[in-house]
Amino acid sequence: DKKEPDMFLLSECKAPEENEKINLGCLVIGSQPLKISWEPKKSSIVEHVFPSEMRNGNYTMVLQVTVLASELNLNHTCTINKPKRKEKPFKFPESWDSQSSKRVTPTLQAKNHSTEATKAITTKKDIEGAMAPSNLTVNILTTSTHPEMSSWLLCEVSGFFPENIHLMWLGVHSKMKSTNFVTANPTAQPGGTFQTWSVLRLPVALSSSLDTYTCVVEHEASKTKLNASKSLAISGCYHLLPESDGPSRRPDGPALA
């Protein structure tokens, strides 16, 4: 029998204002062609399915929806309709309850030559016991063989406490639009710290002529900013998808809540 597809629900790390729109994502990985949808169907919900890609026998598909924050009280559900029906409801991240409505605007700029993670100087901590994120990586997730298809970058960060953290992506000259990426809710890891990840959809397939992309991480509690970059001219890809057996989990870590 074919293994059931893995489903991962994604949301922005920061709680939205009541009048704002927010992006939610559903990442599905399975051994068979997939068909996924989002419920409920409403004219105010903008739905976009990124083209399915296959790598090492696994199909990967991302469904992204943009919804009004005021409508998050609805029963939002990601549903796999093919090959076998399976659904997963969206749940509010616990971290949203503790977040202030005030937002922080990152001031970091992308550096074309940067290919390693760089850490800003950590100043006095506002929260007792706060731990700055220590591990940040950006890797190529998949590479399409067709120009009309998209490629993906995966940014992973871990070792931080408390869990409130902000991730964003930069191109060479400007910040990437939030409609181009989705970020997972932070999950606990051994030692009382947290980890999270973000997937960026690139507008075109990988090419040596394309630019460098930078993942920026802001952890306000520890007054820490990190950034890591990946040049698309670097050859080779990283296989970060889960194996065909075993329990459901995120591409490189424990299951999402």
From Swiss-Prot:
One Pfam match: C1-set
Location of region: Disordered: 89-111
Signal sequence segment: none
Domain of life of the native organism: Eukaryota
Localization (cell): Secreted
Disulfide bonds: C26-C78
Keywords (A to Z) from UniProt: Disulfide bond, Glycoprotein, Immunoglobulin domain, Repeat, Secreted
Keyword Ribosomal protein set for record: no
Principal location listed in the UniProt entry: secreted
SUPFAM superfamilies per record: Immunoglobulin
Residues that carry a glycan: N58, N75, N112, N135, N227
Gene3D superfamilies, per the entry: Immunoglobulins
Ig-like domain boundaries: 5-105, 133-233
Polar residues biased stretches: 96-111
Name the UniProt record assigns to this protein: Ig delta chain C region secreted form
